[in-house]
Design a protein with these regions (language model features):
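Active-site neighborhoods and metal-handling regions in enzymes and metal-associated proteins
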Residues: 1-172
């Protein structure tokens, strides 16, 4: 869990199908058609990392491939916009437009973030538009960002799943 990363080490979350983030690895056997997000955080020499990728098990259906391609497109566009002088909202506008144009919903309960000596630092980087553009933080040289595209096929609603108090899944 996240405490392992904060005290030094590695944290891996495995998010299967309706799990958006923080899926706890277990004995579940994956099957063809599953969508699996692998989220890895490492604390090394006083600094944190946070990275993830999402893949399909086996050959994805056309609708699953479109879903995965949309996430990659949204991330790539946001990365291209992440330049000094831009505002966080430039990234948010692009991510929200990309996922919603494809027919998906941007998750509003979770955001990307700055990262460095602490796992979650300012600025928050939502994949949806919030607040006034003029008050959105400006990107400056030296910022390290964890740009996270969190989106659902259904509604944007998420909920803590099970009794673990950690796993967050879609509500539909």
């Amino acid at each position: 869990n996240i405490n392992n990363v904060s005290s030094g080490g590695l944290c891996t979350n495995i998010n299967v199908n309706d799990v958006v983030v923080h899926g706890i690895p277990g004995q579940r056997k994956l099957k063809s058609g599953d969508v699996v997000g692998i989220d890895v955080g490492i604390w090394w020499k006083g600094f944190h990392t946070d990275t993830s990728t999402t893949v399909a098990v086996g050959s994805p259906t056309p609708s699953i491939q479109k879903f995965l391609d949309t996430g990659k497109e949204a991330l790539n566009k946001a990365i291209l916009l992440a330049r000094p002088g831009r505002r966080i909202q430039d990234l948010s506008i692009s991510m929200q437009r990309t996922v919603e144009t494809a027919g998906y919903s941007a998750v509003r309960a979770l955001t990307g973030h700055g990262i460095g000596r602490h796992l979650h630092e300012e600025p928050a980087i939502p994949c949806f538009v919030v607040g006034a553009y003029a008050t959105s933080p400006k990107l400056v040289p030296g910022m390290v960002l964890a740009i996270e595209i969190m989106y659902n096929q259904g509604t944007s609603d998420v909920v803590y799943q099970n009794a673990d108090g950690w796993t967050i899944a879609t509500t539909d």
